[in-house]
Amino acid sequence: MADVSDAVDVGGAQPKKRTFRKFSYRGVDLDQLLDMGTDELVKLFHARARRRFQRGLKRKPMALIKKLRKAKRDAPPGEKPEPVRTHLRNMIIVPEMIGSIIGVYNGKTFNQVEIKPEMIGHYLAEFSISYKPVKHGRPGIGATHSSRFIPLK
């Protein structure tokens, strides 16, 4: 009996330490990704993103990155930066954008998206759905031939 209570005391005295999985993108740690130049970073992306970066970032994507830099710079330490609104749904997320808040336009409203490390290499559009998912209900009048015999409510 005494042995059982001793085992419980030993287990309760030391709380179990939680270990978090360290993020890596294609085998490269987040710290290294942030220090990496564009040329090395592009080599890690999938083919479509590589092609996009090799063709060069045009004026609008560069303007978005500049606005994100400014929002991060103006934010007080420890606080989240101000959201930056954009229509650029086809912008590929790069490590520099991590921690920023972006309002992505879905055709009607701006959905706020906080950029996390897991989003690297994806498009902004993937995180702001542009349609309302279908909620299938009962079929309407004229949906099938048998619906002629369904009374009108």
UniProtKB/Swiss-Prot annotation:
Gene name, Swiss-Prot/TrEMBL: RPS15
An annotated Gene Ontology molecular function: RNA binding
GO CC terms, sorted: cytosolic small ribosomal subunit
Protein family per UniProt: Belongs to the universal ribosomal protein uS19 family.
Protein name: Small ribosomal subunit protein uS19
Superkingdom of the source species: Eukaryota
GO BP terms, alphabetized: ribosomal small subunit assembly; translation
Pfam families assigned: Ribosomal_S19
Keywords (A to Z) from UniProt: Ribonucleoprotein, Ribosomal protein
Organism whose genome encodes this protein: Elaeis oleifera
InterPro entries: Ribosomal_uS19, Ribosomal_uS19_CS, Ribosomal_uS19_euk/arc, Ribosomal_uS19_SF
